[in-house]
Amino acid sequence: MSNNQILFERAQKTIPGGVNSPVRAFRSVGGTPRFVARAQGPYFWDADGKQYIDYIGSWGPMIVGHVHPEVLSAVQNVLADGFSFGAPTEAEIEIAEEICKLVPSIEQVRMVSSGTEATMSALRLARGFTGRSRIVKFEGCYHGHADSLLVKAGSGLLTFGNPTSAGVPADIAKHTTVLEYNNVAALEEAFGAFGDEIAAVIVEPVAGNMNLVRGTPEFLNALRALCTKHGAVLIFDEVMCGFRVALGGAQQHYGITADLTCLGKVIGGGMPAAAFGGRRDIMAHLAPLGGVYQAGTLSGNPIAVAAGLKTLQLIQAPGFYDALTAQTKRLADGLAAEARAAGVPFVADSIGAMFGLYFTERVPTSFAEVTKSDTERFNRFFHLMLDEGVYFAPSAYEAGFVSSTHDDAVIDATLAAARRAFAALAA
């Protein structure tokens, strides 16, 4: 029995399902989860000492690679000063200033500890600001595990085949209207029917939790125009795509401004940190200035802030995103080329440092199209690549991530492994 198997059996005795987040359990793809012993750059090593090229990167945060020396040094420099204070620090101001500089639509920002906290707080703020209750979200978009957002969500729920979580009261779910992603006609119809009841529309402008699905410019521009017309708050959930698709996130990529933005992943540099922010007149409704309450003991934690601030500084290096985008595109295009050569129906897409792999005939644009993926073939591909030492997301419904440490040699090794994997699939 491998060390991974021993650890998984042991974990299941004290941890539900043996994991602290469902997708890690390999339930979708089968087999034994890999328990990570250490990581460095684009690699991690499991409990059995096997090395893997890592295309998850902690589900997005590790954009400069694992254990970047400057991030490590930044964390080490603050450790001796204290782990948590429950009081403000200068470092909180510094990371807030950096975020506001990089995402111009964010005039003020509030730090929290997780993406779920960010989206949950942004929705409460939007409701408090507008005095309305209804929110609109989109099929397959995952915004964390708050009750009102676990309605036809993607990510782990899609992996387990459950569009809506048990334990969500109908009285809460009734305030959430779910529309098809990228469907402008459905959006216009909804706003025509009850636009003046909508407090907020929350959307992943680049969805990463039903695999990678891009929002179309037409769809996102329609969202912006309709929210403005009806006085609804437009919330971009950029927890995943923020600082991933461009330095200024999806808003820079599309040239569309949100009223509120949720951030996470990259802004913690691998530590637990997230944020929400936006227009000053909306943020002024937050306590202690306004009547919308939001708080957190570990919000703005000094260690997380140190890691996040250094990461945000590193990604501003000249040419950083050009190189990262090019490497990610090279990976996606290369995988698609290897599949074509083997005669395997497969397509790939990338935007910035995110990519999607699909066992379909074309790149999907909606939740419904994503669910047509050949999951059995994906599962075989996943395990073939895992055996080759390449770690993709253990689900056909998750995006992948590339870091600045995934150099040409790493991409070449991945494509060589994929050539063998696709050949095995075609046999």
UniProtKB/Swiss-Prot annotation:
Protein name: Glutamate-1-semialdehyde 2,1-aminomutase
GO molecular function terms attached to this record: glutamate-1-semialdehyde 2,1-aminomutase activity; pyridoxal phosphate binding; transaminase activity
Cofactor: pyridoxal 5'-phosphate
Keyword Cell membrane found: no
Reactions it catalyzes: (S)-4-amino-5-oxopentanoate = 5-aminolevulinate
GO annotations of cellular component type: cytoplasm
CDD domains attached to this UniProt entry: OAT_like (cd00610)
Source organism per UniProt: Burkholderia lata (strain ATCC 17760 / DSM 23089 / LMG 22485 / NCIMB 9086 / R18194 / 383)
This protein's UniProt keywords: Cytoplasm, Isomerase, Porphyrin biosynthesis, Pyridoxal phosphate
Family statement: Belongs to the class-III pyridoxal-phosphate-dependent aminotransferase family. HemL subfamily.
NCBIfam families for this protein: hemL (TIGR00713), PRK00062.1 (NF000818)
Subunit structure: Homodimer.
The encoding gene: hemL
GO terms of biological process kind: protoporphyrinogen IX biosynthetic process
Classification of source organism: Bacteria, Pseudomonadati, Pseudomonadota, Betaproteobacteria, Burkholderiales
Keyword Isomerase among record annotations: yes
UniProt modified residues of type N6-(pyridoxal phosphate)lysine: K265
Coiled coil spans: none
SUPFAM superfamilies (UniProt xref): PLP-dependent transferases
Domain of life: Bacteria
Compartment annotation: Cytoplasm
Pathway info: Porphyrin-containing compound metabolism; protoporphyrin-IX biosynthesis; 5-aminolevulinate from L-glutamyl-tRNA(Glu): step 2/2
UniProt EC number: 5.4.3.8
PROSITE patterns reported for this sequence: AA_TRANSFER_CLASS_3
